[in-house]
Amino acid sequence: MPLVTPIDISDPSVKELVKFFNETLGFCPNSVLTMQRRPNIAKAFIELNMAVMENHGKLTSEFKRLLAFVSSNTAGCRYCQAHTIRAAERYGSTSKRLENVWDFKNQDAFTDAEKAALEFAQEASMVPVNVAEDTEKQLHVYWSDDDIVEIMGVIALFGYLNRWNDVMATSLEGDAKTSGQDLLKGISWVPGKHA
């Protein structure tokens, strides 16, 4: 059961939230409907989300969602695992990438540059943070400083979301739950407290 009940989707105050998130996920997340209890928190989150997910360099929308999945998988947030894998699919990821991102190191579906970024996301998402020097060096082989800022933006954004949703025990929406069950069989995904 969620710690705090989200605002009802029919509430007029969430009209713009629903519109914004319909593009990314196909629905407005319960996490944002909960944040909306304090509208400035929801507004600040959406502005940060938009800034982080905007593409300026080599990172694509699809790859940013896969980075977010690796970050969320490392943190153990099942709510965010389901959301990020769904968003990656909606942004054009292939079934091979979606079904194997949890094992990216051993997959030919990912380039060496992507593997370096995903390894960085994994290590940067551990608590305590444990990014190896070699990982940082590999990151710089493939990515510019500007790209690394975008990568770190995704990791930091999902650090917030992983903590928010795990502590709040945010209830998963039906479509996100289906995406988790369909696309995350390789990690025996279950919704846990987010059911």
Predicted segments, located by residue:
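Hydrophobic alpha-helical segments
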Residues: 1-195
